Swiss-Prot record:
Pfam families: Mei4 (PF13971). One of its GO terms (cellular component) is nucleus. Keywords: Chromosome, DNA recombination, Meiosis, Nucleus, Sporulation. It comes from the Eukaryota. Required for meiotic induction of recombination, viable spore production and chromosome synapsis. Component of the MER2-MEI4-REC114 complex which seems to be required for meiotic double-strand break (DSB) formation. The lineage of its organism: Eukaryota, Fungi, Dikarya, Ascomycota, Saccharomycotina. It comes from Saccharomyces cerevisiae (strain ATCC 204508 / S288c). InterPro entries: MEI4 (IPR025888). GO terms for biological process: DNA recombination; meiotic DNA double-strand break formation; sporulation resulting in formation of a cellular spore. This is Meiosis-specific protein MEI4. It is found in: Nucleus; Chromosome. Interacts with MER2 and REC114. Component of the MER2-MEI4-REC114 complex.
Length: 408
């Protein structure tokens, strides 16, 4: 036998040994994959066909639409009383079903997002969609095992995407809309929805179809216990999603200079929220000072920063918060204090969800805006240090927004 043939045989044997070792490793370390490989080997033609059909599987929009109607069945009188408006949710629900393994920002195209609210008026948003959004927000935040949240959660996400679409489009066409957005979905959400409606149970006026849902018939009333952390987390997703969509819009336009005003517009939106956070911390300081002595030592840097800022902080939100909570009964003060801390924490976490990398080129080119953000962050940190609330201080120190930030 020639030397060349011997070498070929040795290589073949070595190759076979390598494959045997490889298969043995798969069999021992991943039995599921091994069984799948065996079953595929037994029926190659059938399995290839199955794989192709699985890969090219098209989701039937009609089937999805049936599901969304099924999920709102317990609220038929409230959600299906206007089927022409409810129909606007169907394409959004189909979009969610087709992209359930992707993040919202990665899945949606800007034109597609705009199309979701194209034929929906602001009046329809305010009078029909928004009240139902708040109802589902409250229901999804209930501490109960009586409700299957899965379907309702999808309907809530559908409504939230509609709101993101509407507000993202309106901010571009109406410069005053930024303030409206923050006043309605941050300030009013905290002052009127959380403090008044949820904590103090004022102005509830729930429609009959909702009261029937809450009343379980065994003496239980489902709306008695709310998970405030979940409530804030669900709702503030709306805020950072709108900000992120605005940043993605700017990023997709390659011409930098015309986008300067849009960058500034997003920063103003962010600054409004920062003022609300600061105002809430000042409210917290007033509450804490009623129960324990707060010592402000002017020798400490953070105390000097706090006192300086106390004079210059815009009082609009601060006065409104004080006005709302001044009527809170003594027995509810403990609950109010708890909610205050949760809201502050949730808003700080919201800032971590903003896609700051999209703002980075602008902040580098115009450092004055970054300095302004750094200053506002310093004001918030100083106020938190005055409260001596360890959880809030620790969470804030660990947070990173637009840049690596030095602590006071």
């Amino acid at each position: 036998m020639s030397r060349g043939k011997l070498e070929d045989m040795e290589q073949k044997e070595t190759s076979e040994v390598d494959w045997i070792i490889c298969f043995a490793l798969i069999q021992s370390r991943n039995p599921t994959l091994w069984k799948r490989a065996l079953s595929r080997k037994k029926g190659d033609v059938e399995d290839v066909g199955a794989l192709k059909s699985e890969k090219n599987l098209k989701i039937n929009p009609r089937e999805n639409s049936k599901h969304i109607y099924k999920w709102v069945a317990p609220f038929e009188n409230g959600f299906l009383n206007n089927k022409s408006l409810f129909a606007h949710l169907e394409p959004i629900y189909n979009f969610l079903c087709q992209n359930k393994y992707k993040s919202f920002e990665d899945a949606v195209g800007l034109k597609e997002l705009q199309s979701f609210s194209k034929d929906v008026s602001t009046a329809d948003i305010n009078n029909w969609f928004l009240p139902r959004y708040k109802i589902l927000l409250k229901i999804l935040s209930l501490k109960t095992k009586e409700i299957d949240f899965r379907g309702l959660s999808q309907v809530f996400q559908t409504l939230q995407i509609l709101l993101v679409s509407h507000y993202s489009h309106r901010i571009d066409s109406d410069s005053s809309f930024k303030r409206t957005l923050i006043d309605v979905h941050v300030f009013n959400f905290i002052a009127k929805f959380l403090f008044n409606r949820i904590l103090l149970k004022k102005n509830q006026n729930d429609p009959k179809w909702l009261q029937n849902f809450y009343d379980q018939g065994d003496g239980k009333h489902l709306c008695d216990k709310v998970d405030y952390k979940r409530l804030c987390s669900l709702h503030f997703t709306l805020i950072y999603s709108i900000i992120n969509i605005q940043l993605i819009k700017i990023k997709t336009n390659q011409t930098f200079e015309p986008q300067i005003l849009k960058y500034v517009s997003v920063l103003k939106l962010i600054e409004h929220i920062l003022i609300i956070i600061e105002s809430l911390i000042h409210v917290l300081i007033r509450f804490v000072s009623k129960h324990k002595l707060i010592c402000i030592n002017r020798k400490k840097a953070y105390c000097r920063v706090y006192l300086e800022r106390e004079l210059s902080l815009k009082k609009t939100y601060l006065k409104n918060f004080y006005s709302v909570i001044s009527g809170v009964p003594e027995k509810e003060l403990g609950g109010l204090l708890k909610i205050l801390k949760i809201v502050i924490l949730s808003l700080l976490e919201t800032f971590e969800s903003i896609e700051w990398q999209h703002l980075k080129p602008f902040l580098e080119k115009f450092p004055a805006h970054e300095i302004s953000l750094q200053k506002k962050r310093k004001y918030i940190q100083a106020a938190l240090l005055i409260t001596a609330e360890r959880n809030l201080i620790a969470r804030f120190r660990l947070s990173r927004w637009f840049n690596e930030t030095e602590n006071i």
